From Swiss-Prot:
This is Unknown protein 7. It comes from Daucus carota.
Amino acid sequence: YGLAADNVLDAR
């Protein structure tokens, strides 16, 4: 879930 969370924050 680390990468997914990072991607979401970056996508925001």
